Every structure is written in structure tokens, then in C-alpha cells.
Amino acid sequence: MKWPIRGVYFFFEPGENRAKTSEPRVVRIGTHALKFNSKTTLWNRLRQHRGYADQRGNHRGSIFRCHIGTAIINKEKLQDKFPDWKKRSASREVRQKETLMEKRVSNHIGKMPFLFLSVNDANGPSKRSYIEKNSIALLSNFGKIKTSSAVDPPSEDWLGHHCSNENVRLSGLWNHNHVQHEKVHPEFLNTLEKTITQAG
């Protein structure tokens, strides 16, 4: 399989389905290389999230991994075993102690199917960032999860309910940017449809 250099990805999660169908609901949207000097490819970004062949990973290089880890830690009350998980940097000794949790995070994300949309535009602010931002705004249930206006809310057993990040808990997505009451651009769905058609 030939991977596109750049694109937008959509993760799903076992047990998380849309409200009125049995179809899986999107739980995370993301892209990469939003800075002009970035050389990160779509495949490299997905590998950062999913971890390596031996299931190790680096949650300090992936906010997605960090969110999953905090949720597992909070759910199982493991804060004393992983007190440095949310810190931006850590010694080699600390990272070695976190190996077990990194593997658990890799195992969880490894079970999550995903789709990607090829958008081979230039690095920096781009159509990819436009699609990412509007997709998140469209699917976010920030502040609506337990109301009648919620659209495809998370299940009661969703791991994200235990995440330390409030935006994750209140939106029903493993995202923290663009989830709070942002408006969807009126031409977004037309743009998304055209991009999907162009990608083949």
C-alpha cells in the first residue's frame, strides 16, 4: 500500500457506535505538518500515535497517547505508579518505569480502526487544517453529551470519560482543540465531499 505524504485521519473505537445505527462513531480527528518547517508525514504521525512493533511508544510526542494514558490511569487509580505521565519531559529512569503503560496505550490504540483522507497540500495552515477543524466542530458534543441535542454521544462505558482533559470528557472526542462551540463553515461539507471525490 502506498501512503499519501499528507492527509487527515479519523479514528474509531470498539464499542463506540452512532446513536441511531450500528455504525462506528468517529472518536478522534487529526492531521500533521501544520508548521511550515515540519517534515512529518501522515504515516509517521499515525505511527507516533499507535506506537511501534514492540508496543512501546512516546506519549510525550503524541497528545492522543497522553489522553488515552491519563484515562487508563484515572480509571484504574494508578496515579501513584505513574506520577509523571502528564509532564512534558522525563528522565530515562521515569520513561522506563512508564513502559508498561506505554504498551497498554499502544494496545488500546492498536485496536482502533481508522480511515484517512489524502490531502497532499503544502506544509502549514492548509486544507488539511480546515478539514480537521471543521470535522471536530461538527462531531463535538461539548457540553451536550447528556442532553437531547447531543449527536452520536459516547457510550456510558467510553474510556474517555476518565480522561484528565476536560475538553475530551465534555466533547466525546479524543481531541482538545476546536471542540468548544466552534461554528462549522457553511461550505465545509461540500469541500469535504469534493476532496473525497478527488482522492478517489
Where are these regions (language model features)?
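GIY-YIG nuclease catalytic motif and its immediate N-terminal context
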Residues: M1-R104, H108-G200
